[in-house]
Structure formats: C-alpha cells, structure tokens
Amino acid sequence: MLYKHVAIASVNHIEAPIRLSSAEIMQRLAPTLERLGIRDNLFEDVAGITARRIWDGPVTPSDAATMAAQKAIAASGISHEAIGILVNTSVCRDYLEPSTASIVHGNLGLADTCQNFDVGNACLGFLNGMDIAARMIERGDIEYALIVNGEASNLIAERTIERLLRPESSAEDFRSEFASLTLGSGAAAMVLGRSELLPNGHPFLGSVTRAATQFSHLCRGNMDRMVTDTRTLLVEGLKLAAKTF
C-alpha cells in the first residue's frame, strides 16, 4: 500500500553510554577461546563489530523508549494530547504483562484516548509499527502516531559470557551463542503524522514485505539466552532479500 497522506515529523535516538569493545569480551572469554582453539578477533573478522553500547546500571526497555520518545516529541513540536497511538516495538520488554507500551504511555502522560500496544517482530518490529500507524493516519483515524523502541542487552551479554566460561562449554555452544554477543543497547522513536499538518515533514510512502517463516527456528531467544544458526540465517536471509527487492 502506498500512502498519500503520511509524513515523518521527527526521528530521534538514545545511545547507551558505555562502550563495550569486542576485545573486552574476548579477553573475558580467553580461557574458553584457548581451550577450544578459537581466535580472539572473531567479532571483527566475522561480524565486523568492534564495539557495542550497554547501559550504565538497571535501565529497562521502557526507560530507554521513554527517553527517546521525549526527544522525538520535543523535536516534532506536537503536543502530547495530539498523539493518537503509541506502538512499542522493542524486542526486550520489562515484563510479559503489562505491555511495555502501557508503561511508556504512562511515563509520557499521553491522553487516555491514545491507543497503546506492543508489536513484536524481532529487528523488523519498528517498520511494522510505522506501517500500522501509517495506515491509521491514511484512513483518517488519527492525526499523529508515536513509534518507540528501547533495547537492553546487558543481561543477555552477561549470561552468555557466564555460560561460555563453563568448563563443559563446547565449540558448538560458542557458535550457537556467538550472535548474542553482537547485541547492543539503545533506543529510538519516531513521530508520524498527516502530511497536510506537516508541510516540512518527510513523506512516508509505504513498505514492502516478504516472509520465509519456515526458517523462524534459526534464531530463538529470550531475555537471557539466544541460540542462532548464524550461517544458515545469513544465507536464507540474503535469498529473501533478493526476492523482496
């Protein structure tokens, strides 16, 4: 679907304050690397990642999303009362219940008429949130929407390192949990609105989606552990990207 009446009012982000280098992680994993014969520059060589960001202390996904949302709302010039929907798209969440969106909604003091809910779809969730909100704006249901995301990778990074340092951890364990140590922390938020109300906004014309859900088992994770078939995920992901574009 192509949109004719949707524009981006603002986009903002929050960087987690602490830089955690790949070298630091590998140094902590040195006993396991030596035991399994794994080189210590694997992150840079395989993933191209030299560092990632983490929070300083106990920052929840809703905390992070709220900080980004406050910046985005201020940059947009839109009043809190004008926002008709809040969609949280974080992979991480504060709790199974209530929704992280409801916590962010309360933190921001949005109107009780503002819909709020979580949308979970891994790293594509933010785009899905944009699309859901844009359809509502296009139909005239609402005038403005707020899409947020807040991620906290501290817990999964620490738990993964702890598991890989166990004497019984194997090379297969390392390969399956390697991707968990590439994750970082941060937050982002976007305000969308009717283009007629945002003469200086950037048009949002639409999106394209394709699915290959027969491969959904290639990466499975929860808050403290993620297991990934990295090679197959890359190969099949590239095939899907080629089919899409």
Name these PLM-found stretches.
Residues D40-V46, T50-D63, V91-Y144:
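Conserved catalytic cysteine-centered active-site region
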Residues E138-S180:
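Flexible, glycine-rich active-site loops centered on histidine and acidic residues
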Residues A68-G84, K243-F245:
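Phosphate/pyrophosphate-binding loops at sites that engage ATP/ADP/AMP, CoA/4′-phosphopantetheine
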Residues L36-F43, Y95-G109, I156-E168, F215-C219:
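Acidic-glycine-rich active-site phosphate/pyrophosphate-binding loop
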Residues M1-G57, S169-K239, K243:
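Condensing-enzyme catalytic core mediating Claisen C-C bond formation in acyl metabolism
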Residues A9-N12, G120, A145-E151, L192:
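Short beta-strand segments
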Residues T50, A82-V87, L108-V119, E168-R175, ...:
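Glycine/charged-rich beta-loop-alpha catalytic/anionic-binding loops adjacent to active sites
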